[in-house]
UniProtKB/Swiss-Prot annotation:
Pfam families: Peptidase_M14 (PF00246), Propep_M14 (PF02244). Its EC number is 3.4.17.-. Substrate binds at H196, S197, R198, E199, R254, N271, R272, S324, Y325, Y375. Residues 138-431 form the Peptidase M14 domain. This is Carboxypeptidase A5. The gene is CPA5. Residues 34-126 form a propeptide. It is an enzyme of class 3 (hydrolase). The active site is at E397 (proton donor/acceptor). GO terms for biological process: proteolysis. It comes from Homo sapiens. The keyword RNA-binding does not apply. One of its GO terms (molecular function) is metallocarboxypeptidase activity. One of its GO terms (cellular component) is extracellular space. Residues 1-33 form the signal peptide.
Length: 436
């Protein structure tokens, strides 16, 4: 599975041993350098029926894990994308062919895209340093994003502040930007990006969005009305440990970095660790699974920090969790096929939002409830938000539909952010105009 080089060390029971393991893991990562994916391919499989979907699902249970689902088996109408290590390609292709599963090669060599990505980042970093600037059209490390946050807050202190809502498993600060024009107990909107660490386009979109808010306040009537009446909170790096690991070691890491005594594999899927429907369909009890839900609801500090903050605030009216990829806008439920009580309103709002998004660059999104549009998923952010009384709960899946997957070129950051902004603006305006 992803992260195998870091997954074979068993932590001891004491805090001292845990610190020792973390130090050892850091040293090991530094010594080994970034994982190499030369020859790894992303295959796209189109299942004809539920039986073929089940055959694809069986691949996740193989030990050791032989595939990494980028888009898992959901329904026959949706493609399944999976990364296959070079060493497993022959066997996996033979498995697909023997069961009559048609496939195509979406990405011929993942390492080629990774090399291009690193070269683009290095070039951008040199330019930023020489001009003492920050590029919104480039990807950045955790350290660079946190440095930008400090500068951003200092430059726009009249409207933006920084709040630390907790610490990650590896003791990174969990930071939230608060956009506010003052006043007490304003109703609020929550936006988070990067809960799955390899989805870099989401962090970049969040950063651009933050800058858009301060740039357009006072100029864009809709945004100005929103911010005069409501506060906006943006968590740019929801999974800081995992995100740092995607830069230092494994670009394709999804989960957080929590470790537990006696468990060989590292990390929990933070979007399966919420209380609503915890442990149900669409999550996994196997710690080595990419959708491992963790030992208990909100066991992960990254999730608990959000729950505690939103609950203590008590006046959030919308929550928007931004993921990639697939070009979708969805609302609850994920764990149930039954519609929520205000399903018609959410459907109409999602329709308006994707229409606004489409007008920017002509990118098409599909929309609907999570369980009927994508797949059944339990213990997810938006289900928890909705069950906690946040009426307008949405989840984005940003660009693209599989040509690059999680390795979306930096040249697409700005257009992705621009179109996403129009959808966000639509949702926020509706929230403003429909108080509850």
């Amino acid at each position: 599975m992803q992260g195998t080089p870091g997954g074979g060390t068993r932590p001891g029971p004491s805090p001292v041993d845990r610190r020792t393991l973390l130090v050892f893991s850091f040293i090991l990562a530094a010594a080994l350098g970034q994982m190499n994916f030369t020859g790894d391919q992303v295959l796209r499989v189109l299942a004809k029926d539920e039986k073929q979907l089940s055959l694809l699902g069986d691949l996740e249970g193989l030990k050791p894990q032989k595939v990494d689902f980028w888009r898992g088996p959901a329904r026959p109408s949706l493609p399944v994308d999976m990364r296959v290590p070079f060493s497993e390609l022959k066997d996996i292709k033979a498995y697909l062919e023997s069961h009559g599963l048609a496939y195509s090669i979406m990405i011929k060599d993942i390492q080629v895209l990774l090399d291009e990505e690193r070269q683009a980042m290095a070039k951008s970093r040199r330019l930023e340093r020489s001009t003492n600037s920050f590029s919104y059209s480039s990807y950045h490390t955790l350290e660079e994003i946190y440095s930008w946050i400090d500068n951003f807050v200092m430059e726009h202190s009249d409207i933006v502040s920084k709040i630390q809502i907790g610490n990650s498993f590896e003791n990174q600060s969990i930071l939230v930007l608060k956009f506010s024009t003052g006043g007490s107990r304003h109703p609020a909107i929550w936006i988070d990006t990067g809960i799955h660490s390899r989805e870099w386009i989401t962090h970049a979109t969040g950063i651009w969005t933050a800058n858009k808010i301060v740039s357009d306040y006072g100029k864009d009537r809709v945004l100005t009305d929103i911010l005069n009446a409501m506060d906006i909170f943006i968590e740019l790096v929801t999974n800081p440990d995992g995100f740092a690991f995607t830069h230092s070691m494994n670009r394709l890491w999804r989960k957080n970095k929590s470790i537990r005594p006696g468990i060989f594999c590292i990390g929990v899927d933070l979007n399966r660790n919420w209380k609503s429907g915890f442990g149900g369909n669409g999550s996994n009890s196997n710690p080595c699974s990419e959708t491992y839900h963790g030992p208990s609801p909100q066991s992960e500090p990254e999730v608990a920090a959000i729950v505690n903050f939103i609950t203590a605030h008590g006046n959030f009216k919308a929550l928007i969790s931004i993921h990639s990829y697939s070009q979708m806008l969805m609302y609850p439920y994920g764990r149930l096929l039954e519609p929520v009580s205000n399903q018609r309103e959410l459907y109409d709002l999602a329709k308006d939002a994707v229409e606004a998004l489409y007008k920017v660059h002509g990118i098409e999104y599909i929309f609907g409830s999570i369980s009927t549009t994508l797949y059944v998923a339990s213990g997810i952010t938006v289900d928890w938000a909705y069950d906690s009384g946040i009426k307008y709960a949405f989840s984005f899946e940003l660009r693209d539909t599989g040509q690059y997957g999680f390795l979306l070129p930096a040249t697409q950051i700005i257009p992705t952010a621009q179109e996403t902004w129009m959808a966000l603006r639509t949702i926020m305006e509706h929230t403003l105009n429909h108080p509850y």
